[in-house]
Regions:
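Catalytic His-Asp segment of secreted/periplasmic serine-dependent ester chemistry enzymes
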Residues: 38, 138-222
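Solvent-exposed loop/turn segments at secondary-structure junctions
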Residues: 31-35, 66-71, 96-101, 138-142, ...
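Active-site segments of SGNH/GDSL-like serine hydrolases
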Residues: 93-97, 122-156
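Surface-exposed cleft-lining segments at the edges of enzyme active sites
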Residues: 99-112, 145-149
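Charged, glycine-enriched surface loops/patches
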Residues: 109-135, 160-164, 168-170
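Serine-esterase "nucleophile elbow" of acetyl-processing enzymes
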Residues: 15-67, 72, 77-86
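Proline-aspartate-enriched helix->loop->beta-strand connector
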Residues: 83-92, 96
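Sec-dependent N-terminal signal peptides
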Residues: 5-14
Length: 222
């Protein structure tokens, strides 16, 4: 009897020293996500927050962003860049180029097609039982008087993502709302950029910090 208890105790002790399986989180997006893996990027900031809360043993963070990507591009590389890696969580942060490129190069994505491809991505992810976090695109221009050229489309595409999140009962990181609220409080000179972005789109240090804070709140609650 004593021998059995000894061996049971030994086994339990050995199990306690085995490394815990980490939750693999993939951030799937465009150049903003690609830059997120840089030292000052939002993905690295999330990793730092995770460590500060003594949760580094629980999560592994992976960036899968490619500059210029739109929702169609994400759909095309979903299998290789996300599903093949067997993540526990995927954070989808897309939409800026779908709107921005309508004006800059005429290669944006119409709203109906945006919703179709976004939903197709979610269908494939859901089939793999991967937890999914949706994010609205933040800004194309930071003016607070609603005079940014593409404010209307940014609101429209953000509403599409909000509706998809609600329909599928998925967690939402509403970066559009968070950025607008931050700019309304701090951008008193109605600047087009320089508050949360370097150029009206790509994040500066404060923008990366805000994105990290908003995403981390949701990720750690899953």
């Amino acid at each position: 009897m004593m021998n059995k208890l000894f061996y049971l105790g030994l086994i339990l002790t050995l199990f306690s020293f085995m490394p815990q399986k980490k939750n693999k989180v993939i951030f799937f997006g465009d150049s903003i996500t690609e830059a997120g893996t840089k030292p000052d990027g939002y993905i690295n900031r999330i990793d730092s927050m995770c460590r500060l809360e003594n949760k580094s043993g629980e999560f592994e963070f992976i960036g899968a962003g490619i500059s210029g990507n739109k929702v169609y591009d994400l759909y095309l590389r979903l299998d290789i860049d996300v599903l093949a890696r067997n993540p526990d969580v995927v954070v989808i942060y897309i939409g800026v180029n779908d709107v921005w490129h309508k004006v800059s190069s005429g290669t944006g994505t119409d709203a109906d097609k945006f919703e179709i491809f976004y939903s197709a991505i979610l269908k494939k992810v859901k089939e793999k039982n991967i937890k999914t976090v949706l994010c609205t695109p933040a800004v194309i221009g930071e003016k607070t008087d609603f005079s940014n050229q593409q404010d209307g489309d940014m609101n429209k595409y953000s509403n599409i993502i909000r509706r998809i999140a609600l329909k599928n009962n998925l967690p939402l990181v509403d970066l559009r709302k968070a950025f607008l609220n931050y700019n309304m409080k701090t951008n008193t000179d109605n600047k087009e950029s320089g508050i949360l972005t370097n150029d009206g789109v790509h994040l500066n240090a404060k923008g990366n910090q805000l994105v990290a804070e908003e995403m981390w709140k949701v990720i750690k609650s899953l």
